[in-house]
């Protein structure tokens, strides 16, 4: 484990890490979980939340909501309610977000490219708090206006300011499996020569299952395109705030090195890890 930490730390020092930030980071500052969002969708449809949750998984329930909203008004963007709800919760928690130690530590890693499957602006707010320039990217137009000095925050599943970009229903997830969207092509290029670090994810999160599948496919495509051997693939890591030997085994089978936290408090565990891997700090 010490060897993995040392290699990861060196990769961060050399700006050779793609950081993926998951929903666990946003939830730690009071933003809604998927379960809370599903409850709100049930409320919108006038369905008992317990019954709603019994009738399908999160993606199929979101799909049902999208179908119902489209039938009521085809002009409505189904994800608009989700976007508005998250935006409102973010406004309520702004002080907590801008003072969150974990978010400050993420910014202080100085990773030039951060991917996130979150729709919120926590990362943008954290960069602004520390007066560090960043550019959120959720479509081709954003890519054209990136300055080299800016940290790129790739909104891989959309941004609440752009409801049409949001990936939240079953069909929208399936659409992203084609691997040929502009963001997929960018990811394929960004992966070359870089390690990947996931934080804020667990196997119960559909995003990590999709991402690990997608990344494996993209690596195989890169290997074919550029003649890269499997041995030349940089290491990928996932931080797990709590030990879970089943999840660890699954991640290892997907060529992702699990690094397990040492505290029962998930937030403290994540903070301790981010401190250890920051090459600017003496640990």
Predicted regions and their residues:
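Short gly/ser/thr-rich secondary-structure transition/capping motifs
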Residues: 1-3, 96-97, 136-138, 177-181
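Active-site-proximal helix-loop elements at catalytic-domain edges
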Residues: 151-173
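A short acidic, glycine/proline-enriched capping/turn motif at secondary-structure boundaries
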Residues: 121-122, 161
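Active-site glycine-rich loop that binds ribose-phosphate moieties when present
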Residues: 168-185
């Amino acid at each position: 484990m010490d060897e993995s930490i040392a290699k990861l730390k060196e990769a961060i020092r050399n700006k050779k890490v793609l950081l993926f930030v998951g929903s666990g980071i946003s939830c730690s500052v009071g933003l809604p979980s998927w379960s809370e969002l599903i409850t709100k969708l049930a409320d919108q449809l006038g369905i008992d939340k317990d019954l709603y949750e019994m009738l399908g998984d999160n993606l199929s329930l979101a799909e049902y909501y999208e179908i119902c909203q489209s039938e009521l008004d085809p002009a409505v963007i189904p994800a608009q309610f989700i976007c508005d709800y998250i935006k409102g919760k973010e406004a309520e928690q702004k002080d907590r977000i801008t003072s969150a130690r974990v978010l400050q530590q993420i910014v202080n890693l100085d990773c030039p490219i951060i991917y996130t499957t979150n729709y919120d602006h926590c990362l943008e707010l954290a960069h602004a708090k520390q007066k560090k320039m960043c550019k959120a990217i959720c479509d081709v137009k954003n890519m054209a206006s990136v300055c080299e000095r800016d940290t790129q925050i790739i909104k891989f599943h959309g941004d609440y300011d752009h409801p049409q970009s949001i990936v939240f229903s079953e069909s929208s997830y399936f659409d992203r499996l084609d691997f040929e969207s502009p963001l997929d092509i960018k990811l394929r290029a960004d992966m070359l020569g870089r390690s990947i670090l996931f934080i804020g994810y667990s196997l119960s999160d559909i995003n990590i299952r999709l991402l690990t599948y997608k990344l494996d496919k993209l690596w195989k495509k890169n290997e074919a395109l550029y003649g890269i051997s499997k041995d030349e693939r940089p290491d990928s890591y996932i931080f797990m705030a709590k030990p879970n030997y089943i999840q660890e085994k699954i991640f290892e089978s997907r060529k992702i090195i699990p690094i397990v936290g040492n505290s029962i408090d998930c937030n403290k565990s994540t903070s301790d890890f981010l401190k250890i891997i920051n090459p600017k700090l003496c640990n």
